[in-house]
C-alpha cells in the first residue's frame, strides 16, 4: 500500500501500475485516490493477499519497479523477496524498493540473489533499494 504521493510517483512515468491491498476499506480509499488524481485508467487494484497477487501476475510481463510497503515486523518482506527470486515478473533491470521498520534486518538479501543499491533511513522507517544480481 502506497500513500497518494507514492502512487502518483509510481504511475507518472509508467504506462501502468498494479496496486495490491488485502483490506477492502483500504482498497476503497486507494480507488478513490486514483480517481481523484485522474490516474484510475493507469492503475489496476488487486484486492487480495500479496502472495496470491504475485502468482496471478506471473506471465503477464516484467515490472520496471516494485514498491513494497508491508505491515512492519511480520517478515512479509522476506517472504515476498524469496518468492520474487525466481519470478518472471522481474528481471535484472527491475528496481525493488522495500519500506520497513528501522530495526528490520536485510542481511539475507544477497543470499537470495539481490544486490542492495542503497538504504535510506527516516525517523521511523527505512527504504531499501534492491535489484536482482550480484
Residue locations for each model-derived region?
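Residue-level signal for inorganic ion chemistry
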Residues: 8, 30, 69, 96, ...
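Short beta-strand element of Class I
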Residues: 15-18
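S-adenosyl-L-methionine
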Residues: 20-61
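C-terminal lobe and adjacent flexible extensions of AdoMet/dcAdoMet transferase-like proteins
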Residues: 132-134
